[in-house]
């Protein structure tokens, strides 16, 4: 059972706005008069909310540039700060945080999960202000629709600002669950806490809003009860990354709850599940009362589980238990890509690769504007078919080859494939002649040198070409 991550603080809240470097002592809201709690929860949030800024130079499915958002301290002793994955990015060139009234300090990317839009940053605990405290997280219960909440952050650079609203609903969109709120969430709020104004607990992480041009009062936050599961696993040094799901499910758009009907079983994944087309996946065998409402529930239920896991299924009208392999996908922070001439290339393994990318071709993640690669006509999300007639399935090998061409100042011929309809085909091919420049491996944990073939293997794919060591 989930438990609340609690924190105790004492003394009186005190601000000194005469000096930019104010000091403050934080008070636990539970010692305040009931009538004042709601209005003082925002003041209390100053003690754990931070600014986050990041710079992305080599994007992995992100966007190049400088960005800012919010975050909040979840474990002072470990120096852990929670924010959105889209705030931290998958491969930040630089990452910094600042507590209120303090200068920015360096942070590192400890864990990132794009399915949940969650990132855990790490700072040196010694650099956290003495008055900084860990937020109290609502890990046990789902928020009640209609309950009062406040979104805190830095909207449009208006630092440490709060907005009020209610929990409007609970939604499942884009493969994950969301808390819906009418508390305004604007640019700069992302990654900040969504606070219960009844308890002072953080119930969610501000994440997204619908376009202001077409809607009003539609904001979304990552549920804290889901984020807490990942945090607990990380505290126990267990990888909480999503497991491989070698199944695609049929989607019924008219159903309010999507039963997990097996549409196809993939055979070339690192795990094999003994399911059949037409099976219905119901729940974990050891928790049959909690039935899955969508694929996100299944993914979340498998986090932290290893080896054999029992699934309750329905087959031909009868319920039975089958045992499936549970194995986490490689951590995003271990992913390594290649930069050449403004292009970022890497592996993008998908569960339906055996249908759409059976040869395991590398993928172009990003092409910088006005770069050599852009001028040559290379585009994002093209597949790399060959370089000078050679096929590369490993960015380390490709890096070594392009390094040699760069040293000789020779041009190379790249052939790429894009999934775009052409006469009697769903793919088109492009030929790109360009000179390699600034060839290097990139990623949070990328090696300095390439072409050595010394990257550790990260799990084999039966029936598929093995990619480089730590590529994701």
Predicted regions and their residues:
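N-terminal activation segment of mature serine protease catalytic domains
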Residues: 23-72, 76, 84, 92, ...
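C-terminal recognition in membrane/secretory proteostasis and scaffolding
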Residues: 24, 85, 239-472
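Conserved active-site neighborhood of the chymotrypsin/trypsin-like protease fold
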Residues: 26-29, 57, 75-153, 157-160, ...
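Flexible, gly/ser-rich surface segments that form the specificity/activation loops bordering the active-site cleft
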Residues: 37, 64, 132-177, 211-218, ...
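Active-site-proximal beta-strands of protease catalytic cores
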Residues: 48-51, 81-84, 142-155, 181, ...
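Short conserved beta-strand and strand-loop elements enriched in small hydrophobics
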Residues: 52, 93-101, 149-154, 307-315, ...
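Gly/Ser-rich catalytic serine loop of serine hydrolases
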Residues: 67-72, 134-140, 156, 178-196, ...
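C-terminal subregion of chymotrypsin/trypsin-like serine protease catalytic domains
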Residues: 197, 201-242, 424, 441, ...
């Amino acid at each position: 059972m989930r438990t609340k991550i609690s924190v105790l603080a004492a003394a009186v809240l005190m601000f000194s706005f005469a000096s930019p470097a104010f000091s403050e002592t934080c008070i636990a809201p539970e010692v305040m008069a009931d009538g004042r709690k709601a209005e003082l929860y925002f003041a209390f949030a100053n003690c754990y909310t931070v600014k986050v800024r990041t710079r992305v130079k080599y994007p992995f499915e992100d966007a190049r540039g400088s960005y800012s958002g919010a975050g909040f301290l979840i474990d002072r002793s470990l120096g852990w700060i929670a924010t959105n994955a889209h705030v931290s990015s998958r491969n930040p060139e630089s990452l910094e945080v600042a507590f209120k009234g303090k200068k920015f300090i360096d942070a590192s990317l400890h864990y990132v999960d794009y399915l949940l839009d969650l990132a855990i940053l790490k700072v040196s605990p010694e650099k956290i202000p003495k008055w900084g405290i860990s937020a109290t997280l609502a890990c046990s219960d789902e928020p009640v629709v209609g309950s009062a909440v406040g979104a805190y952050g830095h909207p449009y650079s208006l630092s440490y600002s709060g907005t009020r609203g209610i929990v409007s609903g609970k939604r499942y969109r884009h493969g994950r669950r969301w808390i819906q709120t009418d508390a305004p969430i604007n640019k700069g709020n992302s990654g900040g806490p969504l606070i219960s104004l009844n308890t002072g607990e953080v119930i969610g992480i501000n994440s997204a809003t619908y376009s202001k041009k077409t809607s009003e009062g539609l904001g979304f936050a990552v549920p804290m009860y889901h984020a807490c599961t990942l945090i607990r696993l990380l505290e126990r040094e267990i990888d909480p990354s999503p497991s491989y799901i070698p199944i695609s499910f049929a989607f019924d758009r008219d159903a309010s709850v999507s039963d997990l009907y097996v549409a196809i079983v993939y055979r070339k994944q690192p795990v094999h599940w003994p399911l059949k087309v037409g099976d219905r996946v119901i729940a974990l065998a050891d928790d049959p009362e909690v039935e899955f409402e969508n694929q996100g529930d299944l993914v979340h239920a498998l986090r932290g589980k290893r080896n054999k896991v029992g699934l309750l299924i329905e087959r031909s009208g009868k319920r039975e238990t089958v045992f499936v392999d549970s194995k986490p996908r490689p951590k995003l922070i271990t992913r390594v890509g290649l930069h050449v001439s403004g292009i970022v290339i890497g592996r993008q393994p998908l569960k339906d690769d055996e249908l759409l990318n059976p040869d395991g071709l590398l993928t172009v993640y990003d092409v910088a504007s006005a770069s050599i690669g852009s001028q040559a006509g290379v585009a994002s999300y093209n597949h790399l078919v060959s370089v000078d007639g050679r096929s590369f399935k490993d960015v380390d090998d490709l890096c070594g080859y392009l390094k040699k061409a760069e040293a000789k100042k020779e041009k190379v011929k790249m052939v790429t494939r894009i999934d775009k309809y052409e006469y009697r085909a769903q793919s088109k091919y492009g030929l790109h002649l360009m000179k390699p420049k600034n060839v290097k491996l990139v990623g949070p944990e990328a090696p300095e040198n390439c072409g050595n073939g010394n990257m550790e293997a990260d799990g084999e794919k039966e029936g598929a070409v093995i990619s480089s060591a730590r590529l994701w």
